Amino acid sequence: MNLSAKTVVVIAIGAALYGIGGLPMFGIPVFANTTLKPAMAVLALFSVLFGPLVGFLVGFIGHWVTDLFAGWGVWLTWVLGSGIVGLIIGLFPSLTRNRLEKGDFNMKDFALFVVLALLGNVFGYGCSAFLDTILYAEPFTKVFTQLSIIALGNTILIAIVGFFILKSVAKRNKQSRNLTEA
């Protein structure tokens, strides 16, 4: 895998923003060891703008950073889950044929964005919950409750914040495509 310097910088910035933004002081505690993080919007934005590989690495590295700085140890199962969330949301550009890059973001695109966010959260953190029961002998009901809360909460948060951000990105992209030289 050969990443360009630009891609490495984008991953580093995204992971830092997601990692620091994911700290407990910026989140809303909702259940045992479970926090809704506004930083999920950062992960979604980087995933949509730069694709599945960047989304995966921003989620994976960023969650690792969160766990390191939070002081509770790195939970690789949930680190992997964040990576999977970024990867799945990162499919958005290819599924929409890069319409956002061209300045288009309609309600059909928004619906796809929300579906990808939901699928990413369910599948990504579903893997985390499953692995927690296998590797750490966590109670199934606990991790299933965590998964349910996180998947729904993150999807709502990503949908609300993401709508406004992606509308703004589309508007900016449309304006920059209309520039002409004098």
From Swiss-Prot:
InterPro entries: ECF_substrate-spec-like, UPF0397. Keywords: Cell membrane, Membrane, Transmembrane, Transmembrane helix. It comes from the Bacteria. GO terms for cellular component: plasma membrane. It holds the Pfam family ECF-ribofla_trS. The keyword S-adenosyl-L-methionine does not apply. Coiled coil: none annotated. It is found in: Cell membrane. The chain crosses the membrane at residues 8-28, 41-61, 72-92, 110-130, 146-166. It is a multi-pass membrane protein. Belongs to the UPF0397 family. This is UPF0397 protein VIBHAR_05109. It comes from Vibrio campbellii (strain ATCC BAA-1116).
